[in-house]
Structures are given as C-alpha cells and as structure tokens.
Amino acid sequence: MKTTNLSKAVTAICVVLIGAGLINAQDWPQWRGPNRDGKVSGFTAPAKWPKELTQKWKTTVGSGDATPALVGDKLYVFTREGSEEVTRCLKAVDGKEVWQDKYAAQAVTGAAARHPGPRSSPAVAEGKVVTLGVGGVLSCLDAGSGKLVWRKDPFPKVVPQFFTAMSPIIVDGTAIAHLGGKGNGAIIAYELSTGNEKWRWADEGPEYASPVLMTVGDTKQIVTLTEKNIVGVGAADGKLLWQLPFAPEKRAYNAATPIVEGQTVIYTGAGRGARAVKVEKKGDGFVTKELWSNPELAPQFNTPVLKDGFLFGLTNRSNLYCINAETGQTAWTDATSQGRGGFAAIVDAGPVIMALPSSSELIVYKPDGKAYGEITRYKAAESPIYAHPVISGKRIFVKDENSVALLMLE
C-alpha cells in the first residue's frame, strides 16, 4: 500500500515534535503549573540520563525572579530593566521576541534592593496575561498582541517589607490578587475582561504567599496565607469562609503556597512547622479539623510537592526532606545542604522529583518515601536561580538573574 502525501506530512510533523521535545508537553500557564501544585504531566525519564543539559537558546531579558509562563508556543517573561517593569512574549522555540509592554516601576529599596526585579509569576488564561509588579501594580495584557487591557494600583507604595512576591490567580474570568502591605491590604478580584472590581476581602494584608483554588462541595474557595492567618474566602464573592491563626514571629514569614488535596490543606512556615487540616461544610458555613502537625520541618521559601502520600521539600537549612502526608511524621532528611537559606523550587516530574535551589543545580532524585536517592544533577545556569523551572516534555526553561534559557534533556 502506498504512503499518501498526508501520512508523509503527519510523519514529518511527528518527527519534528519528538525532536523538539514537544510530544506530551504541557502548558505551564501560572505559578507552579496548571494546577498551582508543582506537578508536571507527560514527562518521561530518559533511559540514560545525559551528562549535561543542552542549551538551545538564551536571551537577556532583565532582572527578576518571576517564573515565566508557557502557553502553547509562547513564553511570557516578566522582568525589570532600569526603572521599568517589562512583560515580554517570546517564541518558545527560539527565544525571539513577539511583543513587549513596559511601565515605570517603583524603586526597590532596603534589603530587597538586591533583587529589584519582579518575583510574581504571570498568570495566563482566556487570552490574557496578568502580572503583579514589585510595587503592587496589577496589569492585564492581551496575550496575543501585548495590548494593555487594564492596569490597577489600589495601594500606591504600600507593599510588604520585602516588596511583593505573591503570584495572581485567574478563576472563572476573574483575576485575583492579595495586594497592599502590613496592616493595609486586601484580596481583590477584578473582572478579567474589564478590570472592574468584583469583590474585596479587606481584613488582612499580604505577606509573600500565593493563593490556590480549593473546592468543598459546590463552593470554590481561594486559600492563602495572610499576615497572621491562613484563610479561605469565597472565589465568587470574597466572603470569609474559615480562618486559622498562623502568625510568623521574628525573622519568619508566610511565604509558602498552601497545598490542596481534595478537602485537605497543608501549610508550612518557619518556626511553626508543617500542618494539615481538613475543611468541611457544616450547615451554612465551613469548619476545619486538624489532621496532623509536624513542628520539625517547616519550609519557608519553597513549597513542597505532594506525591503518592508523601511531601517532598527543602528545609530552611536547605536540606531535602520527606514527610508522610498521612501522618505528618518525618520520613527522612538528607544531611547535605543544597544552596542558600531554603530557597528552591520543587517539582513532581512523574517518575522523578526535581529540585532547583538557588545554587542553580538541578537535582534529580527518586520519589521515595523511605530514603533519599539521588539520580543525577545538572548545572542549569552560571548565576543564582530563584525562579521556578518550567518543565514541558524534554524542555526546561530557566530564568536566572538576567536571562531566560531553554535547556533540553537529550
């Protein structure tokens, strides 16, 4: 039987996709991935891990620790150049710029001046890109053209001590962000298409944690750490549904993203440990029930991943660890320090866990609840990395101090 021209074309396309690492590749449209849980789908571990990563391209984009967002064949990067914050749309295949938007940004002062660029990851949905600048400016751009849709600054020059780090979330046509600073802030929801304010919960200002979405019964909730508590507010109206005290002390901060699994919320903070609660519907309201508490391990500047009943993360002393997520008991802690001060991104890549601490070494290890088992490690950049890696198929996009690069596992 003859091979048709169509089948030849399909075969050629498949070969190109496989070569580019795009088969089973997923989008990474927001902070910590599609579901804000650090999980990668479609990643296949190589039969033999290469000795090093292959750099396909690298381009200078400006300072900042914001994780890029990947949607289709476009990479959205948010950085600072001089006195301006810049959003760029790049072609994922070669790093070439498609469009950019920029505006004058607030000066970053004090200890935070060592990291003057944005830390908040863009959120991409419904044809829009939403960014949050270091000074609290929330912007919405058209994802295709870069045209400004709306820009808001509800708390001018009011920011947390080290400026903003929370990444906005888009839910049902609404952009939601925790804005302002200590003693003066609010979780605010804006209509994505118009920028009109839909609701605000103004009881507490933000620290550095990013919100996640949780559904209990038929109620969608925005769950986040605030200055002093962990809270759940209605995604549709901003009504406070439940809260638990979780105030940091001394040099501790609420910076880790809560982890949601069904009706369970796991949250962590330096000096207070890791905790798990169950959120339940009761009458017209909601109640919480503590499931466990682990005072030993409390990551602050990274968020663990939940995999097969275990939590994998990095301690404040930069030691990789594992907690039994059913009991809260420590399963293991590796003695080797990885980088600086507990800064890291932890990724569930299916057959492996990947950790990228600020040392810029990508550590690949087994998702084993019994013991730490390192598989390999790679140098991902020459300068420190504080952004999350974006993993899609065989592709790994990394943002270092001033550049973004595409690395390949091949």
Residue ranges and their predicted role:
Residues M1-I13:
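Bacterial N-terminal signal peptides that target proteins for export
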Residues T11-I23:
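Hydrophobic helical h-region of N-terminal Sec-dependent signal peptides
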Residues G21-E410:
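Noncatalytic, solvent-exposed loop/strand surfaces
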